[in-house]
Swiss-Prot record:
Enzyme class: ligase
Annotated ATP binding sites: 57, 96, 495, 532
Reactions mediated catalytically: N(2)-formyl-N(1)-(5-phospho-beta-D-ribosyl)glycinamide + L-glutamine + ATP + H2O = 2-formamido-N(1)-(5-O-phospho-beta-D-ribosyl)acetamidine + L-glutamate + ADP + phosphate + H(+)
Binding site for Mg(2+) 2: 122, 273
Binding site for substrate: 99-102, 121, 245, 317-319, 535
Name by which UniProt lists this protein: Phosphoribosylformylglycinamidine synthase subunit PurL
Compartment annotation: Cytoplasm
Entry-linked InterPro entries: PRibForGlyAmidine_synth_PurL, PurL_linker, PurM-like_C_dom, PurM-like_C_sf, PurM-like_N, PurM-like_N_sf
């Protein structure tokens, strides 16, 4: 008889306890069919987390199959802890993005901190040393005190973990809209570097080999965290605060260093982070990938307090833990290593030839499950979508007040400088950061070489909401352009798909169409998807977030020497590359004037993106250009203002466009500055002005003139977010 008081198999069925764990009636019946009997309490919990949306992708898996996952540089694609891409010289870059949305909505500091810790361990589990962190964040408008609290907590959590563990946060993006009220998006990305011969996989194989647990002792924090992340946020969500994990960056640092030492041992067979679904997912997934079985003796698991049941051990998401499989007879070598790093560790089981996942506690069986159905046979749901009716009429922008619109957009938190927030992150630790957070992708040198990794993280919501297919293409192209802007060759990408409930027809269609667009862009831009994450059910009180796909992309710079003088200077001429059209559907201008986005916009020309990108990259590397900036939210006038304010340079420009086109967001455009004495030879490049040593920012069109002090623009742009957060306290 069990020493733990739990519902019986009959009670689980009759009282539908499985529903509270996240299993539907049909899923419960499928579990019964797989087992040939009714599952006990621990088994029900194990299936519920492994078949949760967060772990199984049961609503998104058909769409993920569209993505190209192989390519010239890809060494390891989806299926492991992170993607791995070759960068030459027997080296590779390892990267991935993950969401921690629901936990951050309930406990913003810990939700964000553990999101950072988890993505770091994903990179380390491959054997790579992390070189930088990035993040993509979404919050509701800052006139709401709850959103202010969430923003402050998330930023402190990101900085608190990353700064303590010693990894620089070098790039990111933050946007604000009322559709994220109470449901922030916190997507964390990590990039690492590894030698080819050190690449690890999360696999359990070799009959009789031992399973080692290392890291923090298991507690009751984060139980059913994966299930919680697969539900809508409701008024009852606050009661699920225990589902939010607690991070310890100092233990995280010890675990990282110990793991990176352990991968040098030839006796290491496989390794995986204990992330979502904790010990359950790491162990069962390793067994599935190894084509083997596992027997775990749970009384050997290090626990924080007495009386923790097998159910709690298996579903706990206590942070800073790794699971290793090592060759039989070499266990002490690993235990001694972990002891040296002051980490708890224990041998908790062994690999078997049964293809079953068996859990015992003091010789009593608490679970006996076939591995493959548990890890790989979660139900997949193909639902019916519903196309959105597009508004093909045109809004009127002929009478806008250019100056008033300019300043309203400049100080909107989505467009305003994020330095007030990013300054809370350590951007330089490790001393390899070349380009810090600002107007472009970040660039981090590969230590001991003249190479560098450029990385960016970008998201799109308004355009995806307006037209999911075209918006999906746009978000991939935006990341591509940001890498081109620092002279990098884009290599591959990771994605995080943040959407509402897929059980709603319109949202399911958004997911279907946007991933189709993303896949098409990946094909044409040659940026395969090597890792990723899906976060659904992002809804609060029945209101869904905007569909928000996030793309993290990395690129290679073979020689960083050209970056030594890659900064705009007085006297540099300015050019815009790409046509400016009447593109206002989904723009910040449409949202500002009409309060919503509901109009079509032109499709993006991906072939043109490639041609322009190659030309610009060549011009950068040949030393022709001193700065490249993509034209993004707010349009050309805002882009020029940000350039001027960021570098403290005057600007004089003459542009032949209409007042409204100053704020058009036509895709595929760049603003470039050409070094004095150099000639730009790129198709469709139009000279629009030059940089000066004055404090004057002057833009003239046939219809208007903007003339403002650069110092005033800088003060408004850089001070907007701080003002929102301080005046509302």
């Amino acid at each position: 008889m069990s020493k733990f008081i739990e519902p019986s198999v009959e009670e689980i069925k009759l009282e539908k306890v499985y529903q509270d764990m996240g299993l539907s009636d049909q899923e419960y019946e499928k579990v019964c069919d797989i087992l040939g009997r009714q599952p006990n309490f621990t088994e029900t919990g194990i299936f519920s987390v492994m078949w949760s949306e967060h772990c199984s992708y049961k609503h998104s898996k058909p769409f993920l199959k569209q993505f190209p996952t192989s390519g010239e540089h890809v060494l390891m694609g989806p299926g492991e802890g992170a993607g791995v891409v070759d960068i030459g010289d027997n080296q590779a870059v390892v990267f991935k993005v993950e969401s921690h949305n629901h936990p951050s909505a309930i406990e913003p500091y810990q939700g964000a901190a553990t999101g950072v810790g988890g993505i770091i361990r994903d990179i380390v589990s491959i054997g790579a040393r992390p070189i930088n962190l990035l993040n993509s964040l979404r919050f509701g408008e800052l006139d709401n005190k709850q959103n202010q609290r969430l923003l402050k907590g998330v930023v402190k959590g990101i900085g608190g973990y990353g700064n303590c563990i010693g990894i620089p946060t070098t790039a990111g993006e933050i946007e604000f809209d009322e559709r994220y009220d109470g449901n922030p998006l916190v997507n964390a990305m990590c990039v690492g570097v590894i030698n080819h011969d050190m690449i690890q996989k999360g696999t359990a194989k070799g009959i009789g080999n031992s399973v080692i647990y290392v890291g923090l002792k298991t507690g009751r924090d984060g139980i059913h965290g994966a299930t919680f992340a697969s539900e809508e946020l409701t008024e009852e969500s606050e009661s699920k605060r225990p589902s939010v994990q607690i991070g310890d960056p100092f233990v995280g640092k010890k675990l990282m260093e110990a793991t990176l030492e352990a991968i040098t041992f030839d006796e290491l067979v496989g390794i995986q982070d204990m992330g979502a679904a904790g010990l359950t997912s790491s162990s069962s997934e390793m067994a599935a990938k190894g084509g083997s079985g596992l027997h775990l003796r749970l009384e050997q698991v290090p626990t924080r307090e007495p009386g923790i049941s097998p159910y709690e051990m298996m579903l706990s998401e206590t942070q800073e833990r790794m699971l290793l499989v090592v060759e039989k007879g070499t266990e002490q070598k690993f235990l001694d290593l972990f002891d040296k790093h002051e980490l708890d560790s224990a041998v908790i089981g062994e690999v078997t030839d049964t293809n079953r996942f068996v859990l015992t506690y003091e010789d009593e069986v608490y679970a006996d499950i076939p591995v493959e159905p548990l890890a790989d046979e979660a139900p997949v749901y193909i639902l019916e979508g519903e196309e959105k009716n597009y508004n093909t009429s045109k809004n009127d922008y002929t009478h806008i007040d250019v100056k008033d619109t300019f300043f309203k957009l400049l100080k909107h938190p989505t467009i305003a400088s994020k330095h007030y927030l990013y300054d809370q992150y350590d951007q330089q630790v490790g001393a390899n950061t070349i380009i810090k957070p600002g107007l472009q992708a970040s660039v981090v040198r590969v230590e001991g070489t003249n190479k560098a990794i450029a990385s960016t993280i970008d998201g799109e919501a308004l355009y995806v909401y307006n037209n999911p297919y075209e918006g999906g293409k746009m978000v991939v192209a935006e990341a591509y352009r940001n890498l081109i802007a620092v002279g990098a060759t884009p290599l591959a990408m990771t994605d995080c798909l943040n959407y509402g409930s897929p059980e709603k027809k319109e949202i399911y269609q958004q997911l279907a169409d946007s991933t189709k667009g993303m896949a098409e862009a990946c094909d044409i831009l040659k940026t395969p998807v090597v890792s990723g994450n899906v976060s659904l059910y992002n809804e609060t009180k029945g209101t869904s977030i905007f569909p928000t796909p996030i793309v993290g992309m990395v690129g290679l710079i073979e020689n960083v020497d050209y970056l030594n003088d890659f900064q705009p200077q007085v006297g540099d001429k300015l050019y815009v590359i790409g046509d400016t059209k009447d593109d206002f559907g989904g723009s910040q201008l449409e949202k500002l004037i009409y309060g919503k986005v509901n109009h079509e916009f032109e499709s993006i020309d991906l072939s043109s993106e490639v041609k322009k990108g190659e030309s610009i990259k060549t011009a950068i590397r040949q030393g022709v250009l001193s700065h490249v900036q993509t034209v993004g939210k707010g349009g050309l006038l805002i882009t020029l203002a940000k350039l001027s304010a960021h570098y403290g340079l005057g600007l004089k420009s003459l542009i032949d466009i209409t007042n409204a086109q100053l704020f058009s967001e036509t895709q595929g455009r760049y603003v470039v500055s050409v070094k004095s004495g150099k000639t730009l030879n790129i198709d469709n490049a139009i000279e629009i002005g030059l940089l000066t040593d004055s404090d004057n920012f002057k833009v003239t069109t046939p219809y208007t003139e903007i003339s403002e002090n650069v110092s005033d623009i800088k003060q408004i742009w850089e001070g907007a977010i701080a003002q929102c957060l301080t005046t509302q306290d």
